[in-house]
From Swiss-Prot:
The keyword Glycoprotein does not apply. The gene is menH. Pfam families: Abhydrolase_6. It comes from the Bacteria. Keywords: Lyase, Menaquinone biosynthesis. It is an enzyme of class 4 (lyase). GO terms for biological process: menaquinone biosynthetic process. Monomer. It comes from Yersinia pseudotuberculosis serotype IB (strain PB1/+). It catalyses: 5-enolpyruvoyl-6-hydroxy-2-succinyl-cyclohex-3-ene-1-carboxylate = (1R,6R)-6-hydroxy-2-succinyl-cyclohexa-2,4-diene-1-carboxylate + pyruvate. GO terms for molecular function: 2-succinyl-6-hydroxy-2,4-cyclohexadiene-1-carboxylate synthase activity. InterPro entries: AB_hydrolase_1, AB_hydrolase_fold, SHCHC_synthase_MenH. Belongs to the AB hydrolase superfamily. MenH family. This is 2-succinyl-6-hydroxy-2,4-cyclohexadiene-1-carboxylate synthase. Catalyzes a proton abstraction reaction that results in 2,5-elimination of pyruvate from 2-succinyl-5-enolpyruvyl-6-hydroxy-3-cyclohexene-1-carboxylate (SEPHCHC) and the formation of 2-succinyl-6-hydroxy-2,4-cyclohexadiene-1-carboxylate (SHCHC).
Length: 272
């Protein structure tokens, strides 16, 4: 059994859930991140217990690897089982969002109450696009393996999806992410390339649990994606691709509103 490194956060002492085991919030970070990225939001959602997970190749799971989405989904299930988590809401950002969708659609997700995705890509619809993305990700992976990490990160954060960042914010992210292990990042990047990811929209539309899609109002790529596929979109003000970092208070408020609304819905009303 492979279990991922994680940190548990108990509910606030005054929370009605403090003495009673209720659904957990399980948080999955993006590429180059760690479970700690979610700490400000998780603390603001302190009425719920939280599990902050380090994905393979990241944080305290740096020595772990994964052989694609199905393997990561299995590792997630085993981690939840090892931590005694029977009911949970699953939240993921970017790469973590893609893993969360896959797990909800295809994994062993007994106990899943609902899904929150921030800026997660649903996949690519044809083989030509998938092959092109594989080549692109392999080139990035080669750089992560061979070049000094700060040098690669300088270019990584120049990608169009990070266009909302100013030079100071880019510099802060490069410094923050420079403690990653380049070869481990490369392995995870290749294992979870969009070129390997199935097209998730049809399965997502068939989910029998509620889900929502969160996106910064400056994240034009994923705003367009959510609108194109008519996802249940909620936007975060003054935020780009990493909305939970830019505006944790507004993000936490959206999470809590979704949980409150979804928990009140009868099973027949789980429309998305």
């Amino acid at each position: 059994m492979t279990t991922l490194a994680c940190q548990k956060l108990a509910p606030h002492p005054e929370s009605p859930r403090h003495q009673h085991a209720g659904p957990w919030l399980v948080w999955l970070h993006g590429l180059l991140g760690s479970g700690q990225d979610w700490l400000p939001v998780a603390q603001l959602c302190g009425d719920y217990p939280s599990l902050l997970i380090d994905l393979p190749g990241h944080g305290q799971s740096v020595s772990l690897s994964a052989d694609g989405f199905a393997d990561i989904s299995r590792q997630l299930s085993q981690t939840l089982q090892a931590n005694g988590i029977r009911e949970y809401w699953l939240a993921g950002y970017s790469l973590g969002g893609r893993i969360a969708i896959y797990h909800a659609c295809y994994g062993r997700h007994h106990g899943l109450q609902g899904l929150l995705v921030e800026g997660g890509n649903l996949g690519l619809e044809n083989a030509e696009l998938r092959q092109a993305r594989l080549q692109q990700d392999r080139q990035w992976a080669q750089r992560f393996r061979q070049e000094p990490l700060p040098q690669v990160l300088d270019d990584w954060y120049q990608q169009a999806v990070f266009a909302d960042l100013d030079p100071q914010q880019r510099e802060q992210l490069v410094l923050l992410r420079a403690d990653n292990h380049g070869p481990a990042v490369a392995e995870m990047l290749e294992a979870t390339s969009l070129g390997h990811q199935p097209w998730l929209l049809p399965a997502l539309q068939r989910l029998n649990v509620p889900y929502t899609y969160l996106c910064g109002d400056r994240d034009h790529k994923f705003l367009q994606l959510a609108q194109q596929y008519r996802l249940p979109l909620h936007t975060l003000a003054r935020a780009g691709h990493n909305a939970h970092r830019a505006n944790p208070g507004a993000f936490a408020a959206q999470v809590l509103a979704f949980l409150s609304q979804s928990s009140c819905l009868p099973p027949s009303s789980l429309s998305r």
